[in-house]
Amino acid sequence: KIKIHKFEKLNKILNKDVDLIVLAVSSKGIEWAGERLLEIFQKKIPNILLLTKGLSIYNDNYELLVDKLSRSLLSKGEIEFNISALGGPSLARGLANRVHTSVVLANNDIQKAKELSKLLNNYYYHVNVSDDLVGVEVSAAIKNIYSMAIGAAKGICKKNVSGEIKDKDYLNSASALVNQAVYEMKIFVKFLKGKEETVNGLAGIGDLYVSSAGGRNSKMGSYLGDGMTYSFAKKNQMQNVTVEAADLAFEIGEKIKKDFQQKDLPLMISVINAITKDEKLNVKWELFNYL
């Protein structure tokens, strides 16, 4: 049974015997959440499960959101805590309707991941476990950028043809974009010391599929594919909608372009340029990996 309480009662609720704290704040709210937890706990915080997906830049390095939260929790001295992260395809409406859903819970300690999975598993919610916290976190974040690119497939599949042809024949192009997305995700995950094989799982391909099939990032991608600039599409089509891929591109885009040449990550950098430079999407098909 779910009980909903006002935020003002948070202190009272968390001071009870708590098994797990689930954080689902926005990426910009990570430090705020850390501050609130430190107001309640002084020596030890119950197990934390982070649902937020994203990456940050700290001291010119990529920072996982679990590390950002850890840094916030340690800002006032030593305190005991353990943070896990959740990844995988889990659209809210489907979950609310209790359709079969598979996710992956990651913790550097696989035994801790297994322990927490037992709290969450039920007849429709299936929790896999992983000790590749980096791979799960990074895959979950960057798949938003790639789902935007795949969402553009219908518009960019071929120039100067009718909309009818694009509507019927864009799937070849979408598949090529998916293949390139997975290839690049593995490069980036490996660069950040995660496991390439994690991209093949729920946090990578699984979440990429769901996001590309109709999420907010894919929707923005469709507008970019139609030739709109990001600012025009945001203002006229998605003004009050959060587009996670755009937030991530602004956060890590410049760092990406310092660390990689366009030939290394041609699809990601094409999307980053379209967003951060506010230019029309120009996918460099000729740079794709066809090995």
Predicted regions mapped to residue ranges:
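Alpha-helical architecture
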Residues: 50, 86, 141-142, 205
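Internal alpha-helical scaffold of NAD(P)-dependent oxidoreductase catalytic cores
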Residues: 40, 74-82, 100-197
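Hydrophobic alpha-helical packing residues
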Residues: 37, 69, 184-189, 252
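Short, small-residue-enriched loops and turns at beta-alpha junctions
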Residues: 55-58, 136-137, 210, 241
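NAD(P)-dependent Rossmann-like dehydrogenase/reductase catalytic/cofactor-binding core
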Residues: 143, 150-158, 168-169, 175, ...
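Glycine-rich anion/phosphate-binding loops
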Residues: 27-31, 127-130, 271
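Rossmann-like NAD(P)(H) cofactor-binding subdomain of soluble oxidoreductases
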Residues: 3-11, 15-98, 116
